[in-house]
Curated annotation (Swiss-Prot):
Gene3D superfamilies named among the record's database cross-references: 1.10.10.200, 3.30.70.980
Gene Ontology annotations of biological process type: regulation of DNA-templated transcription
Lineage: Bacteria, Pseudomonadati, Chlamydiota, Chlamydiia, Chlamydiales
Protein name (record): Probable transcriptional regulatory protein CAB166
Major subcellular site: cytoplasm
Family, as annotated: Belongs to the TACO1 family.
InterPro entries: Integrase-like_N, TACO1_YebC-like_2nd/3rd_dom, TACO1_YebC_N, Transcrip_reg_TACO1-like, Transcrip_reg_TACO1-like_dom3, YebC-like
Domain of life: Bacteria
Molecular function, one GO term: DNA binding
Cell compartment(s), UniProt: Cytoplasm
Amino acid sequence: MAGHSKWANTKYRKERADHKRGKIFSRTIKELMAAVKMGGPDPKTNARLRMIIQKAKDQNIPNENIERNLKKATSADQKNFENVTYELYGHGGVGIIVEAMTDNKNRTASDMRIAVNKRGGSLVEPGSVLYNFVRKGACYVPKSSIDEAVLLPHVIDVGAEDLDNDDDEHFLVLCDPVELASVKEKLTALGVACSEEKLIYVPLRLVDCDEQDGEANLALIEWLEKIDDVDEVYHNMA
């Protein structure tokens, strides 16, 4: 799974989890602004905006932050955000996928080049890494809210494909992307709390690394994750 590896020690994983919480906040705000650009600032007539506002509230983003960014999104000089994906090979043949949401693709591309210049690896052509991954829907269920033995029968009942427990804080209920909304709704009806649901990349095969390559890949991944525009980094390192 993304970001979980035998080379990642407890301190690294805790720092990464703390950093990702900030990334989730930032991503939701960018999605909100993009939704306003696409469909207007009124959630009554903009269904996507209405959904993202609810998502922001579920993530405990303060109402004043939501309102401030709604106003900012209507500004004439506010640029449009777009999703971009980069593919890299890290050390020891490990594949890395980077998802970003940016209002300046040139800036983001420059940040990616700086990352590989500083931490190694190489940017590659589209499709060079993606073929080693599959797109899945994922419902994030806090481990503090339910035992795995209790959750597993529910995963089967709602028609999900798998339950992944590699993440330190969440169980990931995996499903076909087109079934994500349905699976989330069914889990909620069963009393299972989903803190987030989204599409992710899951590796089809894992690559074993020696210790030197493993540590070098973690350094590269950490650098990539700290790029402002980057939302998610996936890899297939064992």
